[in-house]
Amino acid sequence: MLSSSPTSFTHPFLSSSPPLSPISPPSRTARISPPLVSASCSYTYTEDSPRLHQIPRRLTTVPASLYDVLEVPLGATSQDIKSAYRRLARICHPDVAGTDRTSSSSADEFMKIHAAYCTLSDPEKRSVYDRRMLRRSRPLTVGTSGLGSYVGRNWETDQCW
């Protein structure tokens, strides 16, 4: 319960009288010196081997098509595709690429080449791929009337009003 009588606090932190004497920190006679740190660095540079310059430049960027990956024209024969694959495999295969290049980059490049070869060497997969490429390259034409002019949904038709 609370009382209305005045209360006196005897705790030194809560009393209104100043402390008797300030406490000074103990003096230290020993001095600690910071540790000495030294560092050195070396760098060596070696010229790229000529083998690196044989890698097709198209593989360093994103190729436009699988034909670009294999560096063959659109109407290439199956023999052209096979010879292009073998030529690129001799350069980019991780077992042949050597230690000059990182194994992950040569493996990635070879996987792209192999995927392109698998698609383009199979006649069914190649025809499906060619149809998709043709569909992507043609712009969508919109008619002025009739059912053929429906181009799909847009923001206004997707709204539920």
UniProtKB/Swiss-Prot annotation:
Expressed in roots, stems, leaves, flowers and developing siliques. Residues 1-31 are annotated as: Disordered. It is found in: Plastid, Chloroplast stroma. Keywords: Chaperone, Chloroplast, Plastid, Transit peptide. It comes from the Eukaryota. Residues 1-36 form a transit peptide. Residues 1-18 have a biased composition (Low complexity). The keyword Metal-binding does not apply. Residues 65-133 form the J domain. GO terms for cellular component: chloroplast; chloroplast stroma; nucleus; plastid. InterPro entries: Diphthamide-biosynth_chaperone (IPR052276), DnaJ_domain (IPR001623), J_dom_sf (IPR036869). Pfam families: DnaJ. Its main location: plastid. Belongs to the DnaJ family. C/III subfamily. PANTHER family: CHAPERONE PROTEIN DNAJ 11, CHLOROPLASTIC (PTHR44240:SF15), DNAJ DOMAIN (PROKARYOTIC HEAT SHOCK PROTEIN)-RELATED (PTHR44240). Plays a continuous role in plant development probably in the structural organization of compartments. This is Chaperone protein dnaJ 11, chloroplastic.
